[in-house]
Amino acid sequence: MSISIQQISYIHPDKEVLFSDLNFAISKGQKLGLVGNNGCGKSTLLQIIAGQLSPSSGVIVRPDDLYYIPQHFGQYDSLTIAQALQIERKQQALHAILSGDASNENFVILDDDWNIEERSIAALDLWGLGQFTLSYPMNLLSGGEKTRVFLAGMDIHHPSVVLMDE
């Protein structure tokens, strides 16, 4: 699936225009690098494409399985590895089902991903993080380890599109 950016603008809360009327498309299999001076809006644009920030105007068409690796990880310090990787709900649903709570909601959340924990642990191991559990706090990891946690997320989620901020 491709990404389409149509007439995207972003205005800071203080009314400063960061960028306006951006238009471009990225086709399946295409690789793109954003290059520009510090503060020109590269990270903001990636956050908008990822759906983590709303544009001031414009339309974005993106795949549902897009995966975003941020530049800075401080906002994840209060989370566990499982929470940062956005697998905690599936993990909880799996444990609930295995404990006898066969509610439809748990099956919907799990979405037949019965090996989510094994895949996640294997991905962490692949990225040199096999010593950490999924419940390990992100704030106890080094910057490089946090980066590798998010890189492991690519192996867990198998996204069609990956956005990497530096």
For the regions a protein language model found, what residue spans apply to each?
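A short, flexible loop at the N-terminus of ABC-type nucleotide-binding domains that lies
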Residues: 1-5, 9-21, 130
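Conserved hydrophobic segment flanking the Walker A/P-loop of ABC-type ATPase nucleotide-binding domains
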Residues: 26-28
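The feature captures the beta-strand-to-loop junction immediately N-terminal to the Walker
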Residues: 35-37
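Helix-to-loop junction immediately C-terminal to a conserved catalytic motif
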Residues: 50
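ABC-family P-loop ATPase nucleotide-binding domains
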Residues: 75-140
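Hydrophobic anchor residue at the start of the ABC signature
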Residues: 151
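Catalytic Walker B motif of ABC-type/P-loop ATPase nucleotide-binding domains
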Residues: 162-166
